[in-house]
Curated annotation (Swiss-Prot):
Protein origin, superkingdom: Eukaryota
PANTHER family assigned: TRANSCRIPTION FACTOR KUA1
Species assigned in the record: Oryza sativa subsp. japonica
Additional facts recorded: Plants over-expressing MYBS3 show increased tolerance to cold stress.
Conditions for induction: Repressed by sucrose and gibberellic acid (GA). Induced by cold stress in roots and shoots. Induced by salt stress in shoots. Down-regulated by abscisic aci (ABA) in shoots.
Domain HTH myb-type: residue ranges: 88-144
Annotated tissue distribution: Expressed in all tissues, with the highest level in senescent leaves.
Protein name: Transcription factor MYBS3
Amino acid sequence: MTRRCSHCSHNGHNSRTCPNRGVKIFGVRLTDGSIRKSASMGNLSLLSSAAGSTSGGASPADGPDAAPTAADGYASDDFVQGSSSATRDRKKGVPWTEEEHRRFLLGLQKLGKGDWRGISRNFVVSRTPTQVASHAQKYFIRQSNMTRRKRRSSLFDMVPDESMDLPPLPGGQEPETQVLNQPALPPPREEEEVDSMESDTSAVAESSSASAIMPDNLQSTYPVIVPAYFSPFLQFSVPFWQNQKDEDGPVQETHEIVKPVPVHSKSPINVDELVGMSKLSIGESNQETVSTSLSLNLVGGQNRQSAFHANPPTRAQA
């Protein structure tokens, strides 16, 4: 028993494998009329026209949904009814020319990054500040990706032309004529005339000796040019300062700092006069027997004998 499709009533397949049912994605069945033109499906108009010619008008692409499919561009461009091709050109944008990009580079070099309004007003007059900022972003991305891989030549690969800043030289004027048009140097003063004359004579003598050594053919080809003015040589003496030492003369002595010595108005007090102690001796002579005794004589003290001192020998005991 052959299979019979419940969708198209044809034999040989079922409803799941029927080619006329379309595509089912996430439970939603899509037909050819609901598919609009996209970037990956740019040949839908050709397919619809080919299907219409083969099927004789039986294809669903010839229905009312075929009009937006056959139109050029994206379906989102025709969202507003009655839109013209001018709006599409405005959305697409006008590409930058080389002259505009050259002016943009010059403005970027002069004003720096961020001043898109100044670049738009002074350099790229035909572009708005927003367009200048967008162009700068693309330019910087291109410059950062230059070393990654080899790319096609683009407008962003242009090098800023620095010759636009420099004003052109007037025609027929050469640098040599500019040097000749410079004002002459002021004449030397009377004080310097003698030195300058001596230097001039020495220079002329050197030039004459050089011309005598050079052959005739070189003189005609390379003439000797003598400068018209020489800077004078001034002789001046170096002043001798007084604080400098003369090698031949005597060496001067430096001043010494005199420190004051304090002078006491009163004589210093002798401690031995206030408190006197006897000297200890071991009977060196008979005359010093009296002084050998230990005694402490205080100023203004009593004359009585101390208990700690021995009695001096008397004449009777002797």
